[in-house]
From Swiss-Prot:
Keyword Coiled coil carried by entry: yes
KW Coiled coil (keyword) present: yes
Keywords: Coiled coil
Protein name in the entry: Coiled-coil domain-containing protein 148
Coiled-coil stretches: 365-429, 461-510
InterPro entries per the UniProt record, alphabetical: CCDC148/CCDC112
Highest taxon of source: Eukaryota
Length: 603
């Protein structure tokens, strides 16, 4: 148990009265009083020792519970770490298989240069030969030595005879020799790995520097679209160039500020490059949507870096967040620059195109005006010639129309004569047609009258049959209604008979109890047992020294104020402003009585 601080000690009050002072005075003056008995210090010591043992056992239980909770918490964290490791292992395997398949497909393609393909195949063959040599010279002898040692150990345990001697010194020398060889091999491999990593880091730095130089050059260079276009107005082109330079300088200044911020963050970083790489790899293992992600990766970082404190890791986390935020700002700045550059380029290109179009329009207007004047002269001559031709055409058309009109008048006279003859013939044909039509109508009327009389006879016969059918159906319906009424009466009679039999059966099995108000109002055996009435009190072996009229442990723990304060203390928040504001607002489970309310602090 941790010791409580000065501010965590409970507020205690000591009350004294005149009777206690008189008692002390009597004891000092050795004046006896029949009200008080002499103290049995031996019994008090025994009781005190018993209390000490009980408190020691309780403290031991609390320590065991804390140790158990700590172990369970550690096991839970390890279990969560295992789940994350397994997911990361599966993801890395998938990435590995994907990369291997992509490399194989790339090598199998025919569009790669022969020289590059030969270099890759030779490098792969060289690596496979080196791996086979490593297995043959390093791994296989170790496995053989291990199997030999296991066989010898098993053989000596089974056949432990006094005449069988096991040369352990020779075996230990052989094992030490193998260890030295392995140590030299691993040192050589470590140096080679360090050299390759240095080469890769150097190439990555060169690539990054080259990409940064390209980006800065791209920021400062004029777009190709603006440089390739020609503008007939030099003032407009120079103003566009100056506007682009101002625009670029503003973004370059912002980018330099962000780069300086990144350099400051990188300079203040406390971890080395390798430790930072391990830190980033551990953070990437835990996905963002994982519950308790920060707790898990901080625990894993403390395991990987035991020489670093939690405060140092949190500080490095802050630096990483700042670096990531600055990089995102840099990306957003570059993307905004590209977008604004594209918009500016489009607007500038449109402006230059409009200027070129306006210049071409002016030149074309001047050319068109000159052509118009030439055309006007040609058209005037052509109009005069066309007018003479038109007058001659009009004269000829008038003569032709006069001749055509005479021919049409003659044709019209002939057509009128023919039309009079055709009308006389048509009248004769119409009279003949109406006579035939009238005869057909009379025949159809006679046929319809005969059919009407036949239908009336059939309808009369059908109505007679329908009346007979309705009469039959009515009688059948009345018969069914009578049967239903009889069935309902029979069912009602059966229900009455069934109710009568049930009532007789109920009277046979009815319970007849005597009226006993004393027994009814007295306590039951169960209630007496629960209330402890008429039950002998159990003998309490260890009684307390003094009877205390206070709260028990369960009542104290059940108070929501204490539980909330313990939760804040475990979280380390009991000294914050939030705790100071929220603790007075929590009300107890049972409000205090009005006569017990203190008015000391209300004055």
């Amino acid at each position: 148990m941790e010791k409580m601080n000065q501010g965590d000690r409970p507020f205690m009050t000591i009350q004294r009265n005149d009777s206690s002072d008189h008692l002390v005075l009597h004891m000092k003056n050795e004046m006896r009083n029949t009200k008080y008995k002499p103290v049995d210090y031996q019994q008090l010591r025994v009781l005190t020792e018993a209390k000490k043992l009980a408190s020691a056992s309780a403290e031991l239980k609390i320590r065991k519970a804390m140790l158990t909770s700590k172990i369970s918490k550690e096991q839970t964290l390890i279990k969560q770490h295992k789940q994350v490791w397994w997911q990361e292992y599966q993801r890395l395997n998938e990435v590995r298989y994907k990369m291997e398949s992509e490399i194989k497909s790339l090598l199998n393609e025919e569009n790669i240069g022969n020289e590059c393909l030969c270099d890759l195949t030779n490098f792969e063959q060289e690596l496979s030969e080196q791996w086979c040599t490593y297995l043959k010279n390093v791994i296989n002898p170790i496995q053989q030595l291990r199997a030999d040692l296991k066989y010898r150990q098993h053989h000596t345990l089974q056949h432990s005879h006094p005449h069988v001697e096991f040369n352990s010194v020779k075996v230990l020398e052989e094992v030490d020799f193998v260890k030295k060889q392995l140590k030299t091999v691993f040192e050589r491999l470590g140096l080679e790995q360090q050299r390759i990593e240095n080469d890769l880091s150097g190439w990555s730095i060169k690539i990054l520097d080259h990409s940064l130089e390209e980006k800065t050059n791209l920021l400062s260079e004029l777009p190709i679209e603006l440089g390739s276009l020609e503008c007939p107005y030099p003032d407009l082109k120079s103003s566009i160039h100056s506007e682009f330079c101002k625009f670029t300088q503003k973004y370059q200044k912002k980018l330099q500020d962000v780069d300086l911020q990144l350099e400051d963050i990188y300079r203040n970083c406390q971890l080395s490059e390798e430790d930072h790489w391990i830190y980033q790899a551990i953070l990437d293992q835990y996905p963002g949507d994982l519950f308790g992600r920060r707790t898990l990766y901080l625990d894993m970082l403390q395991r990987y870096f035991p020489h670093k404190s939690r405060h140092d890791l949190i500080e490095h986390e802050k630096y990483c967040d700042q670096y990531r935020f600055a990089m995102e700002q840099r990306k957003i700045l570059i993307s905004n620059w590209n977008k604004n550059k594209k918009d500016f380029t489009q607007k500038a290109v449109l402006t230059l195109i409009e200027a070129c179009a306006a210049h071409e329009m002016e030149s074309t207007l001047a050319k068109d005006k000159k052509k118009q004047q030439e055309l006007c002269a040609d058209l005037k001559a052509k109009v005069l010639q066309w007018r003479a031709h038109q007058e001659e055409v009009a004269r000829l058309e008038m003569e032709i129309s006069a001749r055509r009109r005479e021919k049409e008048e003659e044709k019209e006279k002939l057509w009128k004569k023919k039309e009079l003859l055709q009308r006389a013939e048509k009248k004769k044909k119409i009279k003949k047609y109406w006579a035939m039509k009238k005869q057909k109508w009379q025949e159809m009327e006679m046929r319809d009258l005969q059919r009407l009389e036949e239908l009336k006879k059939l309808m009369a016969e059908q109505s007679l049959k329908d009346r007979e059918r309705v009469k039959y159906r009515k009688e059948l319906l009345e018969r069914r209604l009578m049967e239903k009424k009889e069935a309902a009466l029979q069912e009602a009679h059966e229900d009455k008979e069934r109710a009568r039999r049930l009532e007789a059966l109920r009277k046979q099995v009815a319970v007849v109890a005597q009226f006993d108000p004393v027994r009814m109002m007295s306590d039951t055996m169960a209630s007496k047992a629960r209330m402890g009435i008429e039950i002998e009190e159990e003998f309490i072996l260890q009684k307390p020294l003094f009877t205390l009229n206070t709260y028990n442990e369960q009542q104290i723990i059940s108070d929501p104020r204490l539980r909330f304060e313990l939760a804040l203390r475990e979280a380390g928040l009991h000294r914050t402003l939030y705790a100071k504001e929220i603790l007075p607002k929590i009300s107890p489970r049972k409000p205090p009585r009005k006569d017990m309310e203190s008015t000391v602090f209300k004055i």
